[in-house]
Amino acid sequence: MKKTVIALLAWFVSSASLAATPWQKITHPVPGAAQSIGSFANGCIIGADTLPVQSDNYQVMRTDQRRYFGHPDLVMFIQRLSHQAQQRRLGTVLIGDMGMPAGGRFNGGHASHQTGLDVDIFLQLPKTRWSQAQLLRPQALDLVSRDGKHVVPSRWSSDIASLIKLAAQDNDVTRIFVNPAIKQQLCLDAGSDRDWLRKVRPWFQHRAHMHVRLRCPADSLECEDQPLPPPGDGCGAELQSWFEPPKPGTTKPEKKTPPPLPPSCQALLDEHVL
C-alpha cells in the first residue's frame, strides 16, 4: 500500500521537476471574452476565470502550481457541484488540476486540460477540512485493489458514488474518467437509475480521482467537442474488456509528436510569449 501511495504522490508532483512549456510562462489569463479554442488535448483559452481558492464547500489543492484557471462554465460547475455535496453532507470537495491561465500543454501529468474545460477532483470527501500543508502535498487515497480488478471495500463509500453521480447528472458535463474498477463498482451499485452512467468512462490510472470534462460552450466557436459516448450505461462488454489480459504481441503505442497548435492558439503564444 505504501508503494501505491508514493507512486500516486509522485504522479501528482512529477511535473514540477520537468522543463516548463511556453504556456507556463503566461502567468495571468489573457484578457477577452471567454473562448475555449481547439481540442481538449491541443488547445488554449482566452478570458479564463480564476477559481476562488477560499470556499466553504471545497478546497483547492497544490495552489503553488497555479492550475486553478478555467472557462467560467468550469468555475460555475465546481461551485455548483460542491454546493450540492455540502447540501447532502457528503463532505468537502477536493479540487485538483484545472488548467493554466491561458490553457495549453502541461510539462507533464496531463495530455488534456488545455481548453479550460477539465478538472480533476479527488475521490475523498473529508469531514474535517484539510490543513494548508495537506493541501500543498495531498495524499491520494488509492481506491483500487492491487490487481486492478475491484475497488477496496474499506475505502469505497456511497458518498463517493453520490459525488460521481452528481457530477454526471450535470448538464454541462460530457465525460467523467475513472478507473475501470471504479466504473465497475458504480455499475453494481446503480440500481435502476442508470442513464448517468453513460458519461462515466473507464480509463487508465484514475485510481484516486475523477477527471470531469465539460462540453464546449455554445459561444466558443473554435472549440472542438468529442463525439458523445456510446449509447447505454457502458457496463457490458466494453467495460469487461478492460479487465482482460493484453493480447500476445501487444505493445505500448509510441509517443506521438504533438500536432500543430490551432492558429488562434499559436497567435496567442506569439503575442504573449515568443
UniProtKB/Swiss-Prot annotation:
GO terms for cellular component: outer membrane-bounded periplasmic space. Keywords: Disulfide bond, Hydrolase, Metal-binding, Metalloprotease, Periplasm, Protease, Signal, Zinc. It holds the Pfam family Peptidase_M74. Binds 2 Zn(2+) ions per subunit. Zn(2+) ion 1 is bound in the active site. Zn(2+) ion 2 is bound at the dimer interface by residues from both subunits. Zn(2+) 2 binds at residues 147, 150. One of its GO terms (molecular function) is serine-type endopeptidase activity. Zn(2+) 1 binds at residues 110, 113, 120, 211. It is found in: Periplasm. The keyword Translocase does not apply. GO terms for biological process: peptidoglycan metabolic process; proteolysis. Its EC number is 3.4.24.-. InterPro entries: Hedgehog_sig/DD-Pept_Zn-bd_sf, Peptidase_M74. It is an enzyme of class 3 (hydrolase). Residues 1-19 form the signal peptide. Murein endopeptidase that cleaves the D-alanyl-meso-2,6-diamino-pimelyl amide bond that connects peptidoglycan strands. Likely plays a role in the removal of murein from the sacculus. Dimer. Belongs to the peptidase M74 family. This is Penicillin-insensitive murein endopeptidase. It comes from Salmonella paratyphi C (strain RKS4594).
